[in-house]
């Protein structure tokens, strides 16, 4: 097989340069905060649907399936949208996630949670794809290092969200788990403004 040299992958020497790029650092902060907020609620969505909303186990499983399928739908929307399209604006999915978290505790009719998790799932996928695309754009000369950092920060957000969600559930119960996540996520709109400004 032919040798394929790695281009613009960067190295550990690239770290100081990466952290001097304000747009990229803002994106890292946005990702850490929003993913933490998201997983405060998502980690406990099944017990929330069962114990608070009063749905059956079958319905909770269906809701998780709809969430996953909506994520696939979000990726298709992103792929088909142009650079100036609504789906490529990072502000839109962030706002969508915040709205989803705020509305989680309301269940006015039976199918409402399915519509909500579908919207939520599409938004988190759009956010993830927006984030990846911007990392590549903001660090085109050190893509591998910048993307590794982004993936690590995303995973830290998952763990932090699960931990924080567990503390909220233990201390204050499940009923407002989405509200707690939304409160943490609201300040991320500030990061969105600066990221979009430098996009």
Report each predicted region and the residues it spans.
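Residue-level signature of mid-helix packing/kink "hotspots" within the transmembrane helices
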Residues: 68-76, 158-159
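C-terminal membrane-cytosol helix-exit motif in multi-pass small-molecule transporters
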Residues: 1-7, 191-195
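Helix-to-loop junctions at the C-terminal end of transmembrane segments
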Residues: 73-86, 169
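Extracytoplasmic gate region of multi-pass secondary transporters
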Residues: 23-64, 69
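A late C-terminal transmembrane helix in Major Facilitator Superfamily
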Residues: 137-174, 178-181
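C-terminal transmembrane helical hairpin of 12-TM major facilitator-type secondary transporters
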Residues: 86-131
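Multi-pass alpha-helical transporter architecture, strongest
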Residues: 182-199
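Juxtamembrane helix-start elements in MFS-like secondary transporters
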Residues: 55-64, 109, 113, 143-147
């Amino acid at each position: 097989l032919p040798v394929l040299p790695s281009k613009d992958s960067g190295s550990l020497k690239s770290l100081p340069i990466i952290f001097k790029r304000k747009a990229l650092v803002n994106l890292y902060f946005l990702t850490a905060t929003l993913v933490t907020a998201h997983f405060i609620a998502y980690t406990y969505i099944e017990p929330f649907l069962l114990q608070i909303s009063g749905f059956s186990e079958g319905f909770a499983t269906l809701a998780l399936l709809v969430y996953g399928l909506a994520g696939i739908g979000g990726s298709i929307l992103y792929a088909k949208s142009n650079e100036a399209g609504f789906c490529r604006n990072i502000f839109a999915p962030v706002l969508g996630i915040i709205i989803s978290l705020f509305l989680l505790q309301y269940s006015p009719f039976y199918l409402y949670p399915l519509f909500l998790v579908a919207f939520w799932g599409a938004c988190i996928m759009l956010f993830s794809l927006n984030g990846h695309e911007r990392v590549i754009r903001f660090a085109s000369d050190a893509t591998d290092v910048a993307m590794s950092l982004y993936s690590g920060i995303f995973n830290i957000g998952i763990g932090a969200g699960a931990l924080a969600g567990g503390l909220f559930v233990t201390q204050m119960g499940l009923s407002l788990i989405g509200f707690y996540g939304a409160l943490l996520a609201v300040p991320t709109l500030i990061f969105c403004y600066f990221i979009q400004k430098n996009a």
